[in-house]
Every structure is written in C-alpha cells, then in structure tokens.
C-alpha cells in the first residue's frame, strides 16, 4: 500500500497561483482485534503494521511482550489486524471496545495513558549509554538524511532507535506515538535491547512521548524540537535525559545532564 499519494493543488507564490502536484501522507485506519474481540482502531501510516501492533499492545500493557502473541494477521484490504494471544493482561483488557485513536492522539487516546502507566514504565532508568555532543550531532545528521518522507510531505513524524554509533531502526508515521510503537515492536521481535539505546524524535517532546520513551526503557531522548514543562518534570522523576533544539552545532540539555558530555 502506498504511504504517499499525489494530489493536484493550487499553490500561491510570488503573487500568483499555479497548479502543481503535491505529495500527501496517506492516512489509514487499522482496527486491532485480540482473540476475536475488537480492541482499538488506530489511524496510521500503512507500513510496518505488525511492528505497530506488537509495539502498541506491549507498551499499553495489553500483553507482556511477543511471547504472549501467537500470531498477527494483517488484512490490508479491510484494515484489520487479527491477533491471537496466549495471554492478555486482565486489567488492561477492560479497555476493549470501540476506541478510536486519531493520528494526533490527544483525548482520544487518554484511556491508554496515565491510568495504567505507573505499572508499565521503568522508574529506575539507569541506562549505561552516554553521548558526547559530537555523537549527538552526527546521529541527528544521519536521522535527517533518513527522513525523506517527512521532507517530501511535511505530514509525518519520524523516530529512531540508536546506539552511540549508529541508527538501528528508523520508523515514520502520521501519528507520533505510532512511530515509537513501530520501533518498539521491531526491537521486541528482534530481541534488541533498548535499555542501552537512545530515541531520536522529529517533534516536540511531550509528556506522552516521554512516557513512551520510558516504556521502551531508553534513558535518552533527542529531538530538534523542545520538551514541555511536564515532560521535563517527568524526565527528572524517571531519570531520563532529554536533549532538544539539536540544530547545527548547538543543543539544549533539559534533564539527566550526567549522560551528555
């Protein structure tokens, strides 16, 4: 399925209109069923859908990890993801029903945030990873080079999992949380440890993005944008290093200063 469509538009520039073709991000609703029961519909970018499903179910505590999932069947034509699970968390299973998560998330996702997060995040973030400023600038440069769809459409969020030396996984999605869930799902299925890794994110570091980072077990998050006040406060409580405004040869460290040299 195409992740970008091409639309004829009228652009106003230099005092005149002209008809051009513009690249637009595809928006795709995916309904997840767990053991034949409808759980949620997520509006997403239609790629790496199995990664999204595994990452979402694990990060939201519906399952404990890939070991609880027997199979994931993605039916692209109907927008269905059918999951067969051998274990479902009974507490979080109460969220079953017709939940609809838009690409911008917000209140439509509130049932999946803060109510059960305390038991899902690692409040003892002690990742061994440390980064120098030169490492950060190099990683961000590589991240930007892998952001073709973002630059093409301006309508997606990018996220990456990286070590001090390289980007391991890079995923994009119209939903900022989805991009992180796709990374988490891939890492879980590959057996890749996230505790000694960092997250690179294309957008603002909100409290919800900070919680997602904590659920992944990463001790550092890097972004070209800034964190919110609540995100900084949560980062200090969870011992997560937040680095923002990474542009050119400058950056700001907002929390967890000891990991950046």
From Swiss-Prot:
> Does the keyword section mention Cytoplasm?
yes
Where it sits in the cell: the answer is: Cytoplasm
Any idea which GO molecular function terms this record carries? sulfur carrier activity; sulfurtransferase activity
Give the family this protein belongs to, as stated in its UniProt record.
Belongs to the FdhD family.
Specify the species: Listeria monocytogenes serotype 4b (strain F2365)
Protein name per the record: Sulfur carrier protein FdhD
Name of encoding gene:
fdhD
Which Gene3D superfamilies does the record associate with it?
Answer: 3.10.20.10, Cytidine Deaminase, domain 2
* Protein's job: Required for formate dehydrogenase (FDH) activity. Acts as a sulfur carrier protein that transfers sulfur from IscS to the molybdenum cofactor prior to its insertion into FDH.
Q: Residues that bind Mo-bis(molybdopterin guanine dinucleotide), according to the entry?
A: 245-250
User: Could you tell me the Gene Ontology terms of the biological process aspect for this record?
Assistant: Mo-molybdopterin cofactor biosynthetic process
Q: Could you name the domain of life of the organism this protein comes from?
A: Bacteria
Q: Where is the active site?
A: 105
What keyword terms does UniProt attach to this protein?
Cytoplasm, Molybdenum cofactor biosynthesis
Record's Gene Ontology CC terms?
A: cytoplasm
* Entries under Pfam families matching the protein: FdhD-NarQ (PF02634)
């Amino acid at each position: 399925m195409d992740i970008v469509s091409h639309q004829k538009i009228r652009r106003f520039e230099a005092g005149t209109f002209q008809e051009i073709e513009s690249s637009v991000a595809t928006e795709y609703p995916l309904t997840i069923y767990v053991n034949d029961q409808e759980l949620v519909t997520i509006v997403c970018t239609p790629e790496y859908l199995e990664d999204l499903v595994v990452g979402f179910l694990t990060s939201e505590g519906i399952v404990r990890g890939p070991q609880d999932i027997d199979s994931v069947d993605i039916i692209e034509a109907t927008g269905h993801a059918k999951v067969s699970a051998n274990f479902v968390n009974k507490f979080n299973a109460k969220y079953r029903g017709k939940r609809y998560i838009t690409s911008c998330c917000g209140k439509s996702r509130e049932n999946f945030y803060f109510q059960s997060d305390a038991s899902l995040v690692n409040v003892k973030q002690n990742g061994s990873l440390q980064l120098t400023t030169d490492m950060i600038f190099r990683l961000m440069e590589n991240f930007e080079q892998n952001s073709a769809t973002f630059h093409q459409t301006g309508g997606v969020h990018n996220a990456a999992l990286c070590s001090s030396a390289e980007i391991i996984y890079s995923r994009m999605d119209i939903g900022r949380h989805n991009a992180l869930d796709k990374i988490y799902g891939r890492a879980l299925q590959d057996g890749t440890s996230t505790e000694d890794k960092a997250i690179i994110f294309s957008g603002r570091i909100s409290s919800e993005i900070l919680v997602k980072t904590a659920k992944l077990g990463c001790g550092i998050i890097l972004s070209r944008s800034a964190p919110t006040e609540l995100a900084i406060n949560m980062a200090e409580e969870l011992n997560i290093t937040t680095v923002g405004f990474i542009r050119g040869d400058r950056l700001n460290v907002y929390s967890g200063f000891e990991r950046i040299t």
